[in-house]
Amino acid sequence: MAKEVFQRTKPHMNVGTIGHVDHGKTTLTAAISIYCSKLNKDAKALKYEDIDNAPEEKARGITINARHIEYETANRHYAHVDCPGHADYIKNMITGAAQMDAAILLVAADSGAEPQTKEHLLLAQRMGIKKIIVFLNKLDLADPELVELVEVEVLELVEKYGFSANTPIIKGSAFGAMSNPEDPEATKCVKELLESMDNYFDLPERDIDKPFLLAVEDVFSISGRGTVATGRIERGVIKVGQEVEIVGIKETRKTTVTGVEMFQKILEQGQAGDNVGLLLRGVDKKDIERGQVLSAPGTITPHKKFKASIYCLTKEEGGRHKPFFPGYRPQFFFRTTDVTGVVALEGKEMVMPGDNVDIVVELISSIAMDKNVEFAVREGGRTVASGRILEILE
């Protein structure tokens, strides 16, 4: 059966749900999907089980990898990524956040902000997300006085991480909306959220004129057709027949794009901001992996050593409790990859939590990088610093 062609009739935006594990991110994602399918006859309703679709996730009832769904409002087409809240899987949340233009922060009204609420806010800010909307969930389970306290606490937190004091707060029960899609009172919170997204989130300016770049998020084989790499196009456009380079981790190699798809629909051209799957000619699944990039030939090169400016999180922000010294070996997260690197300090003996410093990093493997790219630094399952590349050394 021939696939349908994706019709680009509305502006496209990437959003996602972030927040602490079990605060209701996947339930809200399902509630939105079901609500939008009622408004638009072509839309497919996805239930909770469809979004949490890996066997391990079903067993644990938590989201491990970021999941994408699509839906439309009257004014926009949204790609929605459901980010994992579980601490072990926060590196996958970084990949998800790297793909979002704006985020919906879920906070359970009956428990308030939790450690991961803060970590997700910090990561969202570092990944360049400018605006968020707060969804105060599980309203049916919370004492009204507690809800007011949680609201104040969350707004303070949102401001602390650089988001607006006028951040909208939508209150409701995602579970109620998901379970009673025909009840206008139950789905009112979803309706308000979607209206708020259309009005409050600014459509991002896309770097369509720059050379093509896509950070590979996932790779899979389609029997008889070849290998597909998926990810968000960071800049530029891509069409069938164009040559691209696979850069980073392994030897750089060239291939040709033989198919461009978004949400299982054919795209005439993929452009900056789109979450796409690209079919690649003559590439085996083992030849390409998450963390590499696909780029216009000759526009980005792999490197190991760079100078960067970093900010070290304080203990209160979930960072280290003690300083680190030359020879420190954490993981560096760029786009969709994480690589161990060794830190050298210039003219300093140590770096304290809360410091802003310049460091030199040598990674254990080469990755595609360019100046001004932002990254997160993690160790032992937590984010300890965030930074930006100042110059590439080798």
UniProtKB/Swiss-Prot annotation:
GO molecular function ontology, one term from the record: GTPase activity
Positions of the UniProt region annotated as G5: 173-175
Keyword annotations of the record: Cytoplasm, Elongation factor, GTP-binding, Hydrolase, Magnesium, Metal-binding, Nucleotide-binding, Protein biosynthesis
GO CC terms, sorted: cytoplasm
Region (G3): 82-85
Stretch list, region G4: 137-140
Top-level taxon: Bacteria
UniProt main location, coarse: cytoplasm
UniProt subcellular location: Cytoplasm
Residue ranges, annotated region (G1): 19-26
EC class (word): hydrolase
Residues where GTP binds: 19-26, 82-86, 137-140
E.C. number(s) listed in UniProt: 3.6.5.3
Catalytic activity: GTP + H2O = GDP + phosphate + H(+)
Residues the entry annotates as binding Mg(2+): T26
Quaternary assembly: Monomer.
Protein family according to the UniProt entry: Belongs to the TRAFAC class translation factor GTPase superfamily. Classic translation factor GTPase family. EF-Tu/EF-1A subfamily.
Functional summary from the UniProt entry: GTP hydrolase that promotes the GTP-dependent binding of aminoacyl-tRNA to the A-site of ribosomes during protein biosynthesis.
The protein's name: Elongation factor Tu
Organism: Borreliella afzelii (strain PKo)
Lineage: Bacteria, Pseudomonadati, Spirochaetota, Spirochaetia, Spirochaetales
